[in-house]
Every structure is written in C-alpha cells, then in structure tokens.
Amino acid sequence: MEDSGFSGVVRLSNVSDFIAPNLDCIIPLETRTVEKKNEEPQVNIRAKKTKNEENKPKEDKKSVKISLADCLACNGCITSAETVLVEEQSFGRLLEGIRNSKMAVITISPQTITSLAVKLEKTPEDLAKLIASFFRRHGVKYVLDSSFARQFAHSLAYEELLLTPSTSRPLLSSACPGFVCYAEKSHGELLIPKISKIRSPQAISGAIVKGYLAKKEGLSPCDVFHAAVMPCFDKKLEHRGNSLGTAELLEELVKEEGVAEDVEEEEENNWTTSLSRGIIIGEDGGASGGYADRIVRDFVAQNGGIVKTSKLNKNMFSTTVESTTTGEIVLRVAKVYGFRNVQNLVRKMKTKKEKTDYVEVMACPGGCANGGGQVRYETMDEREKRLAQVEELYEALPRGNSWEESVREEWKRLDTNYKNLLFTDYKPVETNVAQTLKW
C-alpha cells in the first residue's frame, strides 16, 4: 500500500470505510446486554466463537479512561487511540503542571535538540539556549540535558558486564523502552534475564530530579514537576514524571521565543545551567547513547587489545577486541537497530548461536536519531538526508565534563542508598487481549 499521507489513522485499501482518529479503546472494563443486529457489515473483525455462542446477546463496551503509558504498553490496539492519546500530551497541560508545582524541571535529550536544529537550520548550541530560555521564562527552575544522566549509566555499564557470567551473555542494553516492552511481552523467559538492570538516561534523570534535586531543595518528590522531551513516544513507558514531549511539539514554542535570554552571571556554570549556556554533552559511538563503544573503551583501558569494527548492514555493527599477544578475540560487542535485526538476534539467541558479550539494542532503524518523536519528513529520500544531518550534528557535540563525580558524591551524602535508584528490574507481561482475532 503506497503512502497516502494519512497520519494517525487506520486505512484499508480498496475499501470504502475510513476510520478517523478517536479516543475509543478496544478493551472494555464492563459490558451490558444489547439487542443483536442483523445487518451484514462490510468488514468484520471478531474473536473465534463456538456455535453455542453465536446467538448469545452481545454487550456494550463501556467508556474507559486509560493513561498514555498503559495505552503504549498494550499490544492489542487496532484503533487509532494510541495516536490520539499521544497528541493529547499538549504543552498547555505541561505549562499548567509547571505553574501548579513548587519546583519544575525539564529534561531534554540531545537527539531532540539536533533533530529540531536540522529542521530549523540552527546550531544545536543556539537552539539549546532558545529552549532553555523558553522554559525558564515560564517558571522552570532547571532545564537539564539527559546526557548528564547517561554518564551515570555509562559509568556502571562495564562493571555490570564483568559481573555477568559468560554463560548468561550477551548482556543487552536497556535504554530503549520499545525493545524492553517487546522483550517483556514476547520473549520474557529468554530476554529478560539478559537485559541490563541499569536504568535508561531518562529514568536516571528522573531519579536525579526526584531523589537528588528535591532533597537539595528541601522538597518532597511529589512537590516537584518533572517533564521530559525525548526522541520517541515509547519513553512514556518508563517515564514516571508528569509529562512527555517530543521534537515536533517544541518547534512552535521555539519559533515564538525568537531570542534567548542571557544566563545570569551569578549562576554557577554546571550541569543544571549547561543548556542555558548552549553546552550539550555528546558521546562517542553514535546518537543511540554509545553504550557498545563505552564497553569497548573501558575494556581496552584495563586490558589493552586491538579493536576491529565491521558494518554488517546499515543497522548492524560488530566490534571485536583481539589480544595483543595471542590474537584471540577476547571481547565481542554489537549494535543492533530496527526490529528486523532484533528478531534475527532473538533467533540466534534461541539457537545459542549468538556469541556476543554485549549488544546495544534499539527498536528503531537508525537508532534514537530516527525515533518516532523526532521531526518527521514526507519522503524517504528526505528522511534519510535529514537523518544523516542529525547524526552529523550529534557527532560534532563536545564530549564529557567533570560534573558527574561531584554530583555523585553529594548525592551519596544526602542518601547513602542513592545507587539503588540507578537500577531497575523487569518481568514478563501477561497480556489479557485475545490473540485469536479473525480478519
């Protein structure tokens, strides 16, 4: 079926029906008996029934209120409810939350900034200043770069790999909520024991805001409003904050801002004011976080070795580290982007043919730079061109800073158990949706 330009709808070729976006969910909580109708529908979607059930009175579906997180996590949706719920996450609601809180914090991903910078033809540095200026003008106290939280995740990644027995490998990155949701619902027993327990940068940023900044400001976590602007909608699955935004939602606000306000001179130059100063933290290894590259760097720093990288296809990369004395391969890591490649990885793991030690897994082809919440373009050629520009801008971002260690030490003084907030756990999800729908 060719791309017709429709968005947020279900469209069937060669059929007169057209389903417009609506908030109705296909999963009812309660039902009541109604009279059976005799007309013959043009398109019929039904669960398989026994003969005894054929004439049983049907029941109405009661209106249900569900959260966006629940909607995105549900694998039974064949309506456009998910799209509409995403659209309901408006900045009007976000600004209302900011006004009603004692302290508001916004976390923004560098992928979002670079995507929007390409669209608006601005430098990431100037755009970061504009975004921070807009939110600070509307009452946000801190506008944070999610890359700062990613540094906490990176600092724990290699240690976690060392603690993972070779029989339990490969260790799979946990930064992509789309992949984690897929693992929990489809291959729980196989994948969940192998997924990294380190929280994603967005989740760690939430822990920093609610667990560190709140304590530092003398506030309860519930008094703090925390919103995130991320490269994909699936981030809502792991976001326990108050709101979620994406690149396209920021665009009009940034256009309205025009000129960024200067940062007050007395404000300290640190991780809480970096975006206001146009400082965005980059990372070696691409726009999906550079987890695989960080593992390789830490391994080589401790053990030495010869690093060799090969591109298997545009969404799969393999890196090996060879011993400088024996030439033996002592470490294997990979990057696997896109569900087609993810499914190939799962098949290899099922047959125990996957010998990799660590895999950076992302559900989207192209990784986070091509996330569903990034700026979208009409044609495939335009998308690929813009994606290359986003990746180029991301690669040019400055690397690292010295702020993480000082925050870690102060956080430890405020909460001796702070490290527990940097880890999570997963479990298989049992679905209640019938899998026997007949078209």
Curated annotation (Swiss-Prot):
| Disordered: annotated segments | 38-60
In the UniProt record, does the keyword Iron occur?
yes
The protein's GO terms of the molecular function aspect are: 4 iron, 4 sulfur cluster binding; metal ion binding
Residues annotated as binding [4Fe-4S] cluster 2 are C176, C232, C364, C368
The residues listed in the UniProt record as binding [4Fe-4S] cluster 1, with positions renumbered to this chain, are C25, C71, C74, C77
**Which keywords does this chain's UniProt record carry?**
4Fe-4S, Iron, Iron-sulfur, Metal-binding
Per UniProt, the ranges with Basic and acidic residues bias are 50-60
Query: What is an annotated GO biological process for this record, any one?
Result: iron-sulfur cluster assembly
Q: Does the keyword Iron-sulfur apply?
A: yes
Question: What GO terms fall under cellular component here?
Answer: cytosolic [4Fe-4S] assembly targeting complex
**Family the UniProt entry places it in:** Belongs to the NARF family.
Q: What does this protein do?
A: Component of the cytosolic iron-sulfur (Fe/S) protein assembly machinery. Required for maturation of extramitochondrial Fe/S proteins.
Q: What is this protein called?
A: Probable cytosolic Fe-S cluster assembly factor oxy-4
